[in-house]
Amino acid sequence: LSTAREDLLAAGLAVFDRNGFEGATVAEIRSRARASNGSFFHFFTSKKELAGTLFLEILQAYHAAMISSVDASCGAGEGVARLIHAHLDWVVSNRREARFLFEISRSEWGEEVRGAQRTENSRLTDGIERWRAPLLARGELLPMSAVLFFSQIIGPAQIFCRAWLSGRHTGDPREQVETLIACAIRAVVAPGAPERTGGTS
């Protein structure tokens, strides 16, 4: 059974998805969650706090999907492919959450949310680096910063996903996965790198 807090977060996500952050009201969120005024304010001081909490929970779920997609057994090319698949699969399978994370979320939600976001982003970087660092050391991935590496892999896929989330592009972003993987591999994988760790090219 879901808790009152989970019901409010789910209701908030649905209302933000339909009306945007500005158009959403506490009354509408409460009504959808069948929650009293007292119940809402027991968990959240404002619509903004609920939105910030929702943002961090969705961010954690997205990051968990990304980190779990790669492990020490993946070679450079396979790992890149898995990360792109993980990103596209998560966005398509969690369209409402992805729209909130990438389209609706706001930078002005406060320092508390931004601080927690930085911590989450560091966790993502650390998780990917556990897979990437040995490949870098062996020369199987091209040398570049973690930020540049991630932007080369996820940036192009994310442009496709945002066009789909906003309705500008109707096709499933996963239809382009092979091209996105091929482009990312050219950008970050050293020529001749083996597909799997310990394998041969």
Question: PLM features: what roles do these ranges have?
Answer:
Residues A86-D89, T125-A137, P156, R162-S201:
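C-terminal peripheral helix-coil segments that are non-catalytic and often amphipathic
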Residues Q60-H63, E111-R138, V147-S151, I159, ...:
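Amphipathic alpha-helical packing segments from all-alpha helical-bundle domains
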Residues A4-G12, I29, L50, L54-I58, ...:
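Generic hydrophobic, amphipathic alpha-helix propensity
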Residues D7, V15-E49, T53:
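Helix-turn-helix
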Residues T53, I67-R96, F149-I153, R174:
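Hydrophobic alpha-helical connector segments
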Residues V92-E112, E129-R130, I159-S166:
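Amphipathic alpha-helical segments used for helix-helix packing
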Residues F21-E22, L141, H169:
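Conserved hydrophobic residue
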Residues R99-E103, M144, D172, E195-T197:
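Short, hydrophobic secondary-structure boundary micro-motifs
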